[in-house]
C-alpha cells in the first residue's frame, strides 16, 4: 500500500511540474505610452484630422437641390443612351448559349464572348453586359 501511495504521489508531482512548464510564459505588459507608441502597428498621426462644420438651413437646401439635379441628370443620361449600330451577322457564327469551342467561329451577338470552363472543355457564348 505504501508503494502505490508513493507512485501516486510521484505521478501527481510529475503532472504538476508538467502542467506548470508546458504553459507559455505570460507576456510582458507595456508600462508606458512611449513603448506603446513604438510597438503599435497603427500610427495615430497618419490619419487626417477631422473638422466639424455647422450647417445652416441654406446649405441643407442647396445640397438637396444639388442632389435632385444629379438624380434627374442621371435619369436623363440613362434614357438618352444611343444604341450602337450592330455589325451585320456573318453566316458561320455561334448563337448565344451554344457551344463555341476554339475551332468554332465567333459568337453571332457582338456583345457576346466565348467563355470556356473546365480547362477549355466546355465553352459557350455568353452576354454579360446588358447595356451593350
From Swiss-Prot:
Residues 61-87 are annotated as: Disordered. The keyword Metal-binding does not apply. GO terms for biological process: hormone-mediated signaling pathway; melanin biosynthetic process; melanosome organization. Residues 63-79 have a biased composition (Basic and acidic residues). InterPro entries: Agouti (IPR007733), Agouti_dom (IPR027300), Agouti_dom_sf (IPR036836). GO terms for cellular component: extracellular space. One of its GO terms (molecular function) is neuropeptide hormone activity. The keyword Cell membrane does not apply. Residues 93-132 form the Agouti domain. Disulfide bonds join 93-108, 100-114, 107-125, 111-132, 116-123. Involved in the regulation of melanogenesis. The binding of ASP to MC1R precludes alpha-MSH initiated signaling and thus blocks production of cAMP, leading to a down-regulation of eumelanogenesis (brown/black pigment) and thus increasing synthesis of pheomelanin (yellow/red pigment). Residues 1-22 form the signal peptide. Keywords: Disulfide bond, Glycoprotein, Knottin, Secreted, Signal. Glycans are attached at residue 39. It is found in: Secreted. The presence of a 'disulfide through disulfide knot' structurally defines this protein as a knottin. This is Agouti-signaling protein. Pfam families: Agouti (PF05039).
Amino acid at each position: 500500500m505504501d508503494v502505490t501511495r508513493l507512485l501516486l504521489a510521484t505521478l501527481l508531482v510529475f503532472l504538476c511540474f508538467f502542467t506548470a512548464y508546458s504553459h507559455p510564459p505570460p507576456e510582458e505588459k507595456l508600462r508606458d505610452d512611449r513603448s506603446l507608441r513604438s510597438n503599435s502597428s497603427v500610427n495615430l498621426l497618419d490619419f487626417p484630422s477631422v473638422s466639424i462644420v455647422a450647417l445652416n438651413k441654406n446649405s441643407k437646401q442647396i445640397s438637396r437641390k444639388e442632389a435632385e439635379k444629379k438624380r434627374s441628370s442621371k435619369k436623363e443620361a440613362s434614357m438618352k443612351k444611343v444604341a450602337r449600330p450592330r455589325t451585320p451577322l456573318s453566316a458561320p457564327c455561334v448563337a448565344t448559349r451554344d457551344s463555341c469551342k476554339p475551332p468554332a467561329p465567333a459568337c453571332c451577338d457582338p456583345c457576346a464572348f466565348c467563355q470556356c470552363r473546365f480547362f477549355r472543355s466546355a465553352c459557350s457564348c455568353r452576354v454579360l453586359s446588358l447595356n451593350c
